[in-house]
Structures are given as C-alpha cells and as structure tokens.
Amino acid sequence: MENPKPGRLCRSPGISAYCDGKENTPMKLVYLDNAATTPCCPQALAAVNKALDGPCGNPSSHYSVGYEAKQLVDTGRAQVAKALNADPGEIFFTGCGSEADNWAVKGTAFKLAAQGKKHLITSAFEHHAILHSMAMLERIGFEVSYIKPDSEGYIHPEDVEAAIRPDTALISIMMANNEIGTIQPIKELAAVAHAHKIWFHTDAVQAVGAIPVDVKELGVDMLSLSGHKFNAPKGIGAMYIRKGISPWNFLDGGGQESRRRAGTENVAGIAAIGAALEAATQNLPARMEHEQKLRDYVIDRVLKNIPQARLNGGRDKRLPGNANISFPGLEGETILLDLDMHGICASTGSACNSDSLDPSHVLLSIGLPEEIGHGSMRFTFGPQNTMQEAEYLCDTLEEIIPRRRAMSCMWLQSEGKARVFSLKGEKQ
C-alpha cells in the first residue's frame, strides 16, 4: 500500500482515521465536538449489552422476561430522577431531546389554548427544536414573543417579564446555549413565570451531565434532556414534567410511560441513559474542572496569539467545555476542512444545522456582524480530551489561520493590503 501523505485522510481498508505519513501509522483523531455528540461511556455500553443480551421481553408484558425488561426501565428512570433530584414518576422517556422540546411546546400550547391562552415566550437563540415548534404554532394562529439576548449571550428576567401578556401560556428558555455555551438564570426566569401563573420549560440538553441540574431548586415545570450529550447512545432522551403539570400527549397509542408517551420503550437506550447520567453526575466536579482547564487554555492562547480572534459569549457563566471563537477574514467551513485534514473534529455551530452555510442565528442574535459570524468555530471538550490535544489544536490554528488569511481577499482588504483589480484586469 502506498504511504499516504501527512495529514491526508486514509481510505485504505482497516484504517479509519488519519495517517502521519510514517509507515501508514494512523494519526490520532482529536474529537472536539462534544456539544454535537459524545462517545459512549463504559457504563452505558455495559448497560446496553446487558439489555440486548438478556431476555427480549416487552416491558408491558405480564410474564417473567417482560418483568425483567421493566426492571431495566425502572432502574434507568430512577437513575435519571436521582441525578435531577426529581421523582421517578416525573421522568418520561422520549426518542431524543428534540422530541421532548416539541412535546413541551406543542403539548402546552394545545392544552391551554382552550383557556384562551395562545401566546408563548422564548428566546431568539434557542435550538431549532424550539424555534421551529414555535414557528409551526404561529402558522396556526398562536403568537410568539422572541426575547433577544444581550451581546454576551444572556437573557434577562426583566425582558421576559416585560413580554408577558394575560394570554401567555408558556415561557421556554434554554438552560445553556448549544453554540456559545452561555448559562441562563433559569431559577430567576422560572420565578418570573410562576409569579404570573405561567408554565415554564427549559431545554437543558446541553446542561444535563455538564453542570449541576436540580429541578426542585430551579423550580422548572418541564425540562428536556438528551442522552447522547452525556455519553449515552443516540436515540434516547427524556422529559421531566413536574407533578400537577399535564401538557397534551405528543404521541398517542399505547399506555406506555404512564399513558403520557406511546410506543414500546427503548429498553437498551433507557438502561444506557440512566447509567451514563449516573456516571456523569458522580464525577461532575472533577469533570467540570478538567473541561474548564482545557477550555481556558485554548481561549487564552488563541486570543493572545491569533490577531483579532474573539470569544463569542460571556466567559463567566459558561459551560465548562465550550469555546466559540471567531476568526475574522475567514470562512468557518475553510477552517473546519483544514482542521479535519489535521485529524481535528470541530464545528462551525450546531450540528443540527451544519448543512446550512447561513450565518448562525445564535451569533446574529447577540449582534455579531454576518462576516464575523461566518468565521466562527465551536470547540467543545469532554472528559476524554487531554491537555496534549488542546495544545495540538492551538498549534494547528496558529499554523492554518495566518496561512489562510494570506490568501483571503476579505482579510487582506480589512488590513489594507489587498490589491483590487477591475474586470479588465487593471490594478485600481
């Protein structure tokens, strides 16, 4: 087999990563996109294997193997409830975090519309599962108020309160932004909602497993989470619904999940999400400290060594593993491809919207100009990442950013170094 060039993706059988050009040695993959998804932890894998290798009973069946499957579901539910300081009867499993978001928004809207409440409040930089649910409701006659965050990416309770109307049914504000990592004052926002007898939901998909989340302390009515964000498999999520709150069912059919969410339970996924969240919360302080150390190293070094690089979002109240940085004069897609050729996985924003070349709605909402937003990169760290990987990322950025800027008309013009030519080829 011909020896591949350094930094080139190996297409040869048996090699699935990158090669360093020396005897076909695979280059280590540096995965820095943990906000998009995370690798399964050993506890989750063990739970999946136990569920799949065991009896294949349906949890709703009234015989021994059905009871065994139900025990796995009950254990997973109890683990999730304990991690959130909720009661097991307040945890309802879904197929993903987006399903939980849809359930909270649409289920509340349809439930309370009969009372004449057809107004909802959310933020302008929510995940698209919330924004698209709100847009659907607007198309059928509901009204939605979108609260803009400040320039650092924070929602202020007084702005939310100013948008409340007598017919407001729901306030939904995310706990931590999926692109810039800013953590919102959920306890204060929930208190504002309850002062006006309004239900409050938070999309905590990026928060659960990354920072402490206590539903009783926060005072939320509904909360969405997704297993693959904290080292469980994809395809399993959950919603916390406080006792006394009853949004309309999103899926109708059988009597699963206390007749709240139809469909045979994903036993292996439920076992895994419980095991993964238990593991994440048991080691949470150490995990947060480790991720924040890597995050701060990258932010400090990049802002120091790369001209005009800027951090997007406030630094103090921020997810410990999130660094979203703009590199003016470049397109994020260009940086992304260069990083990929060096074995580094990162993103230009939310993986759920990565096919779009439009500037991030999150960055636009905090007032970033489109040209700056186009050059933004998101690096998100997990417990498996190392300081060596953080150093390698910075080394790579310090090599590719100046090189790409030297070829960028946008950057050269901003620096006053570009020579502009007319269509006839004459230098202006």
List each model region and its residues.
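Pyridoxal 5′-phosphate
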Residues: G14-Q428
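Basic polycationic patches enriched in arginine
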Residues: R8-R11
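Polybasic, lysine-rich low-complexity intrinsically disordered segments
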Residues: N3-K5, N24
